[in-house]
Swiss-Prot record:
This is Cold shock-like protein CspJ. The lineage of its organism: Bacteria, Pseudomonadati, Pseudomonadota, Gammaproteobacteria, Enterobacterales. Keywords: Activator, Cytoplasm, DNA-binding, Stress response, Transcription, Transcription regulation. Its main location: cytoplasm. Gene3D superfamilies: Nucleic acid-binding proteins. It comes from the Bacteria. Residues 7-67 form the CSD domain. It comes from Salmonella typhimurium (strain LT2 / SGSC1412 / ATCC 700720). One of its GO terms (biological process) is regulation of gene expression. PANTHER family: COLD SHOCK DOMAIN CONTAINING PROTEINS. InterPro entries: Cold_shock_CspA (IPR012156), Cold_shock_domain (IPR050181), CSD (IPR011129), CSD_CS (IPR019844), CSP_DNA-bd (IPR002059), NA-bd_OB-fold (IPR012340). It holds the Pfam family CSD.
């Protein structure tokens, strides 16, 4: 089972479709791509928005998956 982590959006560029999340547990910032955002609306995140997510190892390092705004 995948562990859910909470964090705050450090920054997200809606034009480029990616950004970074700072986990609340103090671990290293995690890359997030718009395709990982679970939403029926336009997939974007706002700076300092609280989110819940899981982490998977991507081709360039850790990447957030199943991102849900709280």
């Amino acid at each position: 089972m995948t562990t859910k982590i909470t964090g705050l959006v450090k920054w997200f560029n809606p034009e480029k479709g990616f950004g970074f999340i700072t986990p609340k547990d103090g671990s290293k910032d995690v890359f997030v791509h718009f395709s990982a955002i679970q939403s029926n609306e336009f997939r974007t995140l706002n700076e300092n928005q609280e989110v819940e997510f899981s982490v998977e190892q991507g081709p360039k390092g850790p990447s957030a998956v199943n991102v849900v705004a709280l």
